[in-house]
């Protein structure tokens, strides 16, 4: 229900004040009676408010479904309602076979799918920007990036995390590295932030090579998407690109070890099984990846978000 309201843009239509369900139905080309039933339910859980005569208005929760607000989650809701919804319906297939549910449903991997569907890729990129907004602030507050000269954000997408780092630290320069569809829109994003003079955009595949020249290599929510074997391939390429005094920085959810302890990390791990075939990892599992690729895990820093900052250096 939340997805449908986001897809129809109901919150945007209510930006300038309450509107009748009849007008909303005409604007969205939907059935007035069925739209009323949808909005009546959403109003019962605090998303929109039902007024007299079948009028509806925004609530603080509904404001997150607007398109052009700094705290918007609209693209994230649409992403979960479209590309994510069907694969989760096939999680039984994943549990029985070990195959990624997304691949089973869409007949290709998630990143291949987005390469073939640019409109869906645009929604995904914006969704990841929205998802990462709060954790980005938490990471910036927990870690000193000012000590680096050149920071390489590997798989950095549109550049929202890199932009936040550069805005908070005057000295470092950046390299934004991702697949062509990943950095689509990055130039405009960085230009709008007045950061293009400090950040170079490089297209490429981190399974093939990673740009050299950085003294910090950031992987934010990257390894969780991949199997151990593929992670080892990425880390070997990073080891090859990195100077001897460079720093490896992985920003991810760490799966907590205690049995029976409730944790978002365990749900997130299951989500990766469904979507990418990757997995969440414990501290010990990260240490094993580092040891297999010539790195030493030197520090883990908690943040005021689900992610932690995992530091490593070359051995």
Predicted regions and their residues:
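Conserved Class I S-adenosyl-L-methionine-dependent methyltransferase catalytic core
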Residues: 1-150
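Alpha-helical subdomain
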Residues: 1-52, 145-315
């Amino acid at each position: 229900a939340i997805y449908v309201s986001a897809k129809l843009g109901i919150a945007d239509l209510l930006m300038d004040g309450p509107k009748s369900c009849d007008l909303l139905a005409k604007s969205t080309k939907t059935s007035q009676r069925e739209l009323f039933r949808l909005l009546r339910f959403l109003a019962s859980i605090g998303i929109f408010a039902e007024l007299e005569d079948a009028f509806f208005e925004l609530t603080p929760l509904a404001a997150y479904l607007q398109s052009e607000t700094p705290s918007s989650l609209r693209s994230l809701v649409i992403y979960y309602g479209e590309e994510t919804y069907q694969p989760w319906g096939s999680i039984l297939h994943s549990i029985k076979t070990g195959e990624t549910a997304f691949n089973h449903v869409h007949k290709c991997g998630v990143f291949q799918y987005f390469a073939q569907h640019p409109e869906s890729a645009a929604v995904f990129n914006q969704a990841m920007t929205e998802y990462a907004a709060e954790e980005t602030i938490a990471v910036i507050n927990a870690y000193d990036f000012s000590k680096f000269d050149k920071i390489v954000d590997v798989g950095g997408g549109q550049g929202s995390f890199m932009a936040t780092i550069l805005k908070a630290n005057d000295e470092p320069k950046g390299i934004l590295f991702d697949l062509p569809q990943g950095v689509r829109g990055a130039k405009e994003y960085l230009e709008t932030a007045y950061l293009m003079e400090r950040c170079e955009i490089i297209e490429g595949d981190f399974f093939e090579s990673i740009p050299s020249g950085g003294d910090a290599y950031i992987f934010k929510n990257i390894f969780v998407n991949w199997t151990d074997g593929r992670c080892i391939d990425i880390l070997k390429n990073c080891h090859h690109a990195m100077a001897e005094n460079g720093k490896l920085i992985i920003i991810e959810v760490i799966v907590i070890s205690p049995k029976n302890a409730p944790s978002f990390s365990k749900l997130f791990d299951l989500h990766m099984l469904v979507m990418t075939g990757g997995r969440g990892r414990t501290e010990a599992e990260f240490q094993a990846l580092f040891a297999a690729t010539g790195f030493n895990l030197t520090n883990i820093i908690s943040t005021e978000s689900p992610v932690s900052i995992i530091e490593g250096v070359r051995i």
